């Protein structure tokens, strides 16, 4: 063994008979780690590392059993240590031998070279090393000879197996060659058998197909009943393909099956289309929850436009659908439970059936009919939910009613329920059509069919019908006349060739005008029903007869009769020829209830419109512009005009409102509150629609009309009654005296206006100036009874005119609101882009309820000027009415005093006996002043009452003193009559004007009773001493100033000095009193008496003048 392995030491270097267990590379490495291919390495400390033999040789079993841990060293044998030492020695002594490029011949030559450069002297060491290496190898062999022996035996067995396999493969190749040669040999019998076998296979396949076709009807019906339509289409098409095979053409028994399957193909398409209609138009019970939740969202107008928590967002549903993959059926779930999934499944089934385009055409054709059915059903459902007796029927007002809060709330509930339900259904239908659109679009994209506009154009048709239905709703519930505006230019039904209505088509009667509860109608209906039941039994249901007696008749309690659905535009007029029942009476005020839900619906519809479609979302509200300008605005103008005419024309429009305390602090006209109610209602309604100056202008126009009406009423109050006479009387002279002073520019009017505008209504300077001007004005004309307002109701109406105008001015001023939106449809024939955008400004649907929201009238800077001017007109009319009231009591006093002082109209003041009763004119004046004051207190505020009251005593005092000469001639008993009249007036005035008395006038006439000497004594005592020279000037010029009615410094000084002093009189006043003292003598028929009296009077007047000038 040692010789065998020793002959080739290098072939087994480092293997030890066990292979290359210690190598890290696949190529043989004879040296180790120290060199690129060195097997042993070049460690400088051989004792610190195991030997190469120990690393390459497998550990002995004893060493494997002796492992005590992961860090224990392998126990080496003596042979392994010996070979390691040899290797270390070679590396140390003969390093060239371990190099990869070692040349043994070169080393051998060096060992044989005995020269100084040779290594012959190391030859013995080389031999010893070689001998040491041989012994080490032998020891290794001896230690591992059993492993070597077993390896040799195993090698021979493997070699034998390989040789045996080679022999078998060679024999197999020879057999295959022989088989190939045998198969190439021709055999007619085998060929005949093969043909017969193929024929039998065909017959068996045909029989199997016939057996499969026999079960197709049952399978098809089962799949259709389970609504697994994809499987049903697949079964049907597979069966039809089988029947189209040529080998089955001659089988006559299949003709019935062919006919059946052909019919089933059409029937299946009809079923699929019907199923689509069931889910697109919400007929399926599985669709109810979706549209009901959407209806709730439509009803929440004061919240966001987003989806409610109970409704899955539609865009989220679209995102969850994988349009890139064709839909697949799930037998484990009900396909109808998910409407959108079911629609895509039906579209896929129709496409696989090859009838998708036909189905889309059928959907488009039936779309108007289906929508009409949805709207009609919704109206009927809402009609049953809300009793007609609670929502108000047709009252013959033609939409001119302004309902109270309760009626408005009930009508709003009806419209709210109708629109929320209808728009909820419309939105659900639109979502279904969007899913249908997306399913067809994805189908076309997957099949690469391009952009098929025929299949994808249905959404625009849906929108056109939606637009018509919305327009019809707005038209039915806003306009009171069906012919106010025609949305279609086509002739209306019943119109002749000349455009006139065909009289033959006129309705002779209307069911809405029939009283369904009358006994005559009930008996007629019973007779008709019995005839029908006798002629066609079963046609009418006897169990429902009692409950449906009036089903053929629309009761009178129902609102306005059914109105035609607006089948306007795009070919829908013929299909949409049915009628809708109006649930509430049409009125422009319904616009505030109709428009916000409509805008919410349109806002939500924008998110449903498929992107890239031929329907631009920005144009969804364009039809509302047309409706607003061409329908709503004329209807608003007409309704507003009619309502105003109703307010103006009411018999009690200018009567006191019985419920004035609920709206004002003082009584106002009933017509004024009604007019403001109209204005408020319209402003509230305008607040719910986009701003349009044309609409605001309509309201301002009615305000102007109301001013004109009130001003006409004022003129009617102050115009004299014509009792014949000259008809050519001037317009100015038709008015009563107080109205002339209150309306025409004059100093009296200016003074009174200054007094009213001053903070102190007791300004003595203005009061005495007014008194002097009024006396001067009255002395320049003769007042008669026609100059005075005799009717107390007219006085009260004048007070109400003032309070009404002031109240209306304040209330309307609260409506003032300036907006930056200057849209004015009246200035343009066609809607501009700005006008189309105005609907987007209404993003706050909280205005729909509007009950608690502030009401205002939006106006531009231009429009507000007209608004402010009408408010000024209201204030001016109120001021005119107040001035008229102020002057009326004064003209009445002046007229009564003129009558009482004039001896020509009443008894003379030359009396033979004392008078114990005041003059009837004075008593009449007292009663009129008391009644006048009562009316003022009842109707006006305290400031206005004081404005009218203040100065009455001063006016009576002044007039009695200034016009004392009117009573001439007068004696002592006549003066007593005057004193009695003054006393009666004073007692009465104390109940009207606070702190008033007529002592000055009483003192004045008391000096008459004492005589001329007493007058002079008064003057001598300096009664008028403070008047000085100015008083004398005033005395000489007062007549001219009084007659001209002009205010001079002297007259003002006289007013200041003598106006408020009970015992001081001016020169003119004392002079007139002296003349009055001699009036009886001057009137004596004897000339001597009169001449003597005149001389005495001249002397007394001279003395009076001297006293006055000396003072």
Swiss-Prot record:
Residues 31-41 have a biased composition (Low complexity). The keyword Oxidoreductase does not apply. It comes from the Eukaryota. InterPro entries: Sec8/EXOC4, Sec8_exocyst_N, Sec8_M. Residues 42-55 have a biased composition (Polar residues). Pfam families: Sec8_C (PF20652), Sec8_N (PF04048). Keywords: Exocytosis, Protein transport, Transport. One of its GO terms (biological process) is protein transport. Coiled coil: none annotated. The keyword Acetylation does not apply. The exocyst complex is composed of sec3, sec5, sec6, sec8, sec10, sec15, exo70 and exo84. Belongs to the SEC8 family. Component of the exocyst complex involved in the docking of exocytic vesicles with fusion sites on the plasma membrane. This is Probable exocyst complex component sec8. It comes from Neurospora crassa (strain ATCC 24698 / 74-OR23-1A / CBS 708.71 / DSM 1257 / FGSC 987).
């Amino acid at each position: 063994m040692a010789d065998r392995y020793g002959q080739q030491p290098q072939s087994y270097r480092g293997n030890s008979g066990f292979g290359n267990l210690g190598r890290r590379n696949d190529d043989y490495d004879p040296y180790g780690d120290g060199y690129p291919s060195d097997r042993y390495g070049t460690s400088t400390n051989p004792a610190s590392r195991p030997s190469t033999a120990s690393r390459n040789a497998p550990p002995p079993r004893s060493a494997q059993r002796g492992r005590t841990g992961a860090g224990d060293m392998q126990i080496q044998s003596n042979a392994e240590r010996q070979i390691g030492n040899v290797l270390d020695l070679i590396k140390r002594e003969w390093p060239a031998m371990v190099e990869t490029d070692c040349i043994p011949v070169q080393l051998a030559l060096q060992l044989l070279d005995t020269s100084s450069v040779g290594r012959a002297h190391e030859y013995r060491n080389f031999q010893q090393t070689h001998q040491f290496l041989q012994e080490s190898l032998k020891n290794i062999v001896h230690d591992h000879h059993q492993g070597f022996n077993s390896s040799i035996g195993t090698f021979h067995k493997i070699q034998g197996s390989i040789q045996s396999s080679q022999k078998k493969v060679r024999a197999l190749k020879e057999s295959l060659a022989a088989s190939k040669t045998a198969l190439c040999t021709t055999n007619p019998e085998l060929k005949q058998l093969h043909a017969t076998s193929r024929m039998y296979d065909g017959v068996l396949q045909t029989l199997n197909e016939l057996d499969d076709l026999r079960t197709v009807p049952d399978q098809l019906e089962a799949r259709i009943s389970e609504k697994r339509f994809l499987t049903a289409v697949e079964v049907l098409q597979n069966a039809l393909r089988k029947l189209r095979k040529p080998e089955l053409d001659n089988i006559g028994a299949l003709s019935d099956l062919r006919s059946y399957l052909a019919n089933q193909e059409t029937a299946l398409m009809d079923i699929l289309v019907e199923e689509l209609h069931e889910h697109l138009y919400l007929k399926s019970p599985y669709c109810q929850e979706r549209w009901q939740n959407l209806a709730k969202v439509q009803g929440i107008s004061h919240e966001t436009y987003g989806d409610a928590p109970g409704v899955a967002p539609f865009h989220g549903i679209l995102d969850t659908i994988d349009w890139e993959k064709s839909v697949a059926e799930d037998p484990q779930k009900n396909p109808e439970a998910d409407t959108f999934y079911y629609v895509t499944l039906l579209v896929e089934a129709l496409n696989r059936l090859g009838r998708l385009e036909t189905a889309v055409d059928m959907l488009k054709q039936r779309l108007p009919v289906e929508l009409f059915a949805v709207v009609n059903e919704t109206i009927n459902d809402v009609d049953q939910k809300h009793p007609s007796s609670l929502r108000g029927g047709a009252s013959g007002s033609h939409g001119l009613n302004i309902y109270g809060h309760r009626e408005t709330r009930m009508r709003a509930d009806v419209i709210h329920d109708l629109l929320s339900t209808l728009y909820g259904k419309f939105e659900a239908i639109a979502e279904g059509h969007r899913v249908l659109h997306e399913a067809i679009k994805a189908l076309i994209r997957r099949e690469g069919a391009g952009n098929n506009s025929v299949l994808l154009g249905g959404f625009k048709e849906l929108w056109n019908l939606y637009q018509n239905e919305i327009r019809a709703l707005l038209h039915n519930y806003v306009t009171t006349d069906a012919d106010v505006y025609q949305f279609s230019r086509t002739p209306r039904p019943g119109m002749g060739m000349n455009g006139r209505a065909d009289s033959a088509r006129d309705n002779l009667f209307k069911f809405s005008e029939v009283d369904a509860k009358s006994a005559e109608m009930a008996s007629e209906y019973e007779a008709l029903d019995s005839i029908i039941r006798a002629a066609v039994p079963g046609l009418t249901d006897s169990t429902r007869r009692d409950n449906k007696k009036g089903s053929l008749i629309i009761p009178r309690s129902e609102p306005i009769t059914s109105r035609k659905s607006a089948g306007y535009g795009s070919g829908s007029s013929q299909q949409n020829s049915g009628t809708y029942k109006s649930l509430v009476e049409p009125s422009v005020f319904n616009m505030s209830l109709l428009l916000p839900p409509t805008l919410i619906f349109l806002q939500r519809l924008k998110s449903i419109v498929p992107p890239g479609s031929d329907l631009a979302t920005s144009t969804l509200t364009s039809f509302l512009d047309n409706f607003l300008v061409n329908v709503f605005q004329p209807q608003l103008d007409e309704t507003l005009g009619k309502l105003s005419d109703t307010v103006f024309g009411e018999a009690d429009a200018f009567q006191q409102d019985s419920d004035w305390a609920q709206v004002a602090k003082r009584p106002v006209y009933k017509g004024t509150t009604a007019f403001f109610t109209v204005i408020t209602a319209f402003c509230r309604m305008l607040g719910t629609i986009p701003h349009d100056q044309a609409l605001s202008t309509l309201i301002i126009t009615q305000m102007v009309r109301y001013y004109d009406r009130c001003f006409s009423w004022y003129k009617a109050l102050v115009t004299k009654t014509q009792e014949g006479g000259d008809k050519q009387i001037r317009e100015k002279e038709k008015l009563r005296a107080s109205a002339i002073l209150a309306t025409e520019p004059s100093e009296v009017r200016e003074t009174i206006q200054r007094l009213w505008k001053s903070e102190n209504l007791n300004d003595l300077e203005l009061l005495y100036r007014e008194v002097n001007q009024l006396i001067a004005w009255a002395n320049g004309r003769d007042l008669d009874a026609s100059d005075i307002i005799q009717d107390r109701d007219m006085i009260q109406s004048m007070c109400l005119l003032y309070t009404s105008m002031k109240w209306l001015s304040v209330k309307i001023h609260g409506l003032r609101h300036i907006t930056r939106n200057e849209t004015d449809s009246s200035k343009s024939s066609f809607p501009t882009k700005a006008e189309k955008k105005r609907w987007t400004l209404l993003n706050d649907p909280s205005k729909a309820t509007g009950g608690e929201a502030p009401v205002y009238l939006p106006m531009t800077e231009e429009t507000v000027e007209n608004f402010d001017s009408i408010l000024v007109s209201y204030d001016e009319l109120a001021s005119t009415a107040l001035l008229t009231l102020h002057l009326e009591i004064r003209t009445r006093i002046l007229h009564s005093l003129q009558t009482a002082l004039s001896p020509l109209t009443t008894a003379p003041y030359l009396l033979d006996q004392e008078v114990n009763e005041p003059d009837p004119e004075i008593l009449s004046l007292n009663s009129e002043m008391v009644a006048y004051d009562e009316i003022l207190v009842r109707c006006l505020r305290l400031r206005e009452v004081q404005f009218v009251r203040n100065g009455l005593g001063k006016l009576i005092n002044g007039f009695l003193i200034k016009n004392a000469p009117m009573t001439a001639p007068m004696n002592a008993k006549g003066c007593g009559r005057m004193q009695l009249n003054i006393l009666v007036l004073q007692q009465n005035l104390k109940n009207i004007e606070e702190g008033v008395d007529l002592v000055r006038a009483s003192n004045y006439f008391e000096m008459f009773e004492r005589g001329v000497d007493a007058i002079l004594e008064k003057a001598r005592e300096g009664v008028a001493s403070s008047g000085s020279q100015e008083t004398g000037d005033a005395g000489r010029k007062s007549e001219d100033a009084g007659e001209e009615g002009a205010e001079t410094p002297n007259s003002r000084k006289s007013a200041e000095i003598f106006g408020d002093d009970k015992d001081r009189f001016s020169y003119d006043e004392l002079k007139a009193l002296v003349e009055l003292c001699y009036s009886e003598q001057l009137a004596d028929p004897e000339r001597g008496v009169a001449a003597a009296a005149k001389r005495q009077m001249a002397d007394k007047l001279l003395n009076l003048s001297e006293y006055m000038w000396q003072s």
